[in-house]
């Protein structure tokens, strides 16, 4: 299993880092078999697998439950777990206790925090306490309730400078990596070159040190629409939906199960069953 020191070396050597989300045992198993470098148990699970319209309702118990399943499916892959909405915006002590709970109970190797500002101090204190932290700047889904959109961030000179300053701040605080989401590719390239820690892009161009995409987006599973930055490598819904419809049709028509799908017993053992022929 790769560790933070390996990710630093990959950046230094120009080797791209691959990260894929996973939310359960089978998806984690798939990701590990694909030899991805990292797994992100994102609070995006709230929208992707729990059916919420945002990440806000996701709880710590949700994140722990899903991370434990992921760990069983991918025991040899570095796992990063999101700290969900408002679990790191109270006191430093509360943040440390919440991170401790996630790491100890789920087995996650690192936690991910969105944003900067007061979050920078939380990253520093978690790092001091021995908890690896991945930072996240640009489009931060937990803040969409305030911003009101999933549009590209940091397109103006002022916003770009602010993001650069924040990136340098989270690095100085001790973050082991930085996710850059939905920002101009030119800015992502400059940030990646300015930092010594790896950058993981999603909708941030090819010049980041690595890339992350959602498992379901990659394979086309349960997706109603894809963002511009997503490439579809498969569309398994096209196979799943007809398969399920065929099952329903065959059960209704009594053509499933066939004899080959059934178990049998000797006829003589049936005779006199319960005293009846």
UniProtKB/Swiss-Prot annotation:
Query: How is the cofactor bound here?
Result: Binds 1 Mg(2+) ion per subunit.
Q: Superkingdom of this entry's organism?
A: Bacteria
InterPro entries annotated for this entry?
Pantoate_hydroxy_MeTrfase, Pyrv/PenolPyrv_kinase-like_dom, Pyrv_kinase-like_dom_sf
Q: Which GO terms describe its biological process?
A: pantothenate biosynthetic process
Extract the Pfam families matched here: Pantoate_transf
Entry annotated with the keyword rRNA processing: no
**What EC numbers are recorded for this enzyme?**
2.1.2.11
- Give the required cofactors: Mg(2+)
Residues recorded as binding 3-methyl-2-oxobutanoate, renumbered to this chain, are: 43-44, 82, 112
Q: Mention any one GO cellular component term assigned to this protein in its UniProt record.
A: cytoplasm
User: Which EC class, in a word?
Assistant: transferase
| Residues at which Mg(2+) binds | 43, 82, 114
Q: Which reaction does it catalyse?
A: 3-methyl-2-oxobutanoate + (6R)-5,10-methylene-5,6,7,8-tetrahydrofolate + H2O = 2-dehydropantoate + (6S)-5,6,7,8-tetrahydrofolate
Q: Which residues cross the membrane?
A: none
Broad class of where this protein is predominantly found:
cytoplasm
Sequence similarity = Belongs to the PanB family.
Q: Which HAMAP family match?
A: PanB (MF_00156)
- Assembly and binders: Homodecamer; pentamer of dimers.
From the Swiss-Prot or TrEMBL record, give the protein name. 3-methyl-2-oxobutanoate hydroxymethyltransferase
What taxonomic ancestry is recorded?
Answer: Bacteria, Bacillati, Bacillota, Bacilli, Bacillales
């Amino acid at each position: 299993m790769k560790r933070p020191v390996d990710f630093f070396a990959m950046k230094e050597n120009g080797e791209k880092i691959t990260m894929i989300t996973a939310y359960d045992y089978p998806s984690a198993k798939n990701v590990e078999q694909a030899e991805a470098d990292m797994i992100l148990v994102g609070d995006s699970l709230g929208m992707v697998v729990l059916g919420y319209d945002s990440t806000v309702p996701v709880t710590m118990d949700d994140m722990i439950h899903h991370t434990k399943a992921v760990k069983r499916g991918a025991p040899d892959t570095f796992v990063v777990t999101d700290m969900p909405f408002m679990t790191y915006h109270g006191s430093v002590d509360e943040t440390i206790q919440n991170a401790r709970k996630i790491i100890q109970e789920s087995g996650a190797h690192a936690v991910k925090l969105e944003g900067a500002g007061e979050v920078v101090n939380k990253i520093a204190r978690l790092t001091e306490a021995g908890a690896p932290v991945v930072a996240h700047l640009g489009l931060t889904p937990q803040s969409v309730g305030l911003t009101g959109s999933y549009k590209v961030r940091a397109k103006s000179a002022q916003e770009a400078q602010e993001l650069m300053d924040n990136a340098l701040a989270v690095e100085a605080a001790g973050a082991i990596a930085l996710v850059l989401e939905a920002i101009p590719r030119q800015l992502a390239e400059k940030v990646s070159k300015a930092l010594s820690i790896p950058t993981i892009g999603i909708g941030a161009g090819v010049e980041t040190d690595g890339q992350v995409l959602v498992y379901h987006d990659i394979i086309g599973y349960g997706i109603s629409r894809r963002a511009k930055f997503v490439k579809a490598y498969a569309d398994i819904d096209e196979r799943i939906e007809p398969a399920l419809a065929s099952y329903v049709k065959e059960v209704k028509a009594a053509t499933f199960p066939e004899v080959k799908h059934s178990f049998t017993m000797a006829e003589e053992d049936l005779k006199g069953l319960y005293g009846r022929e």
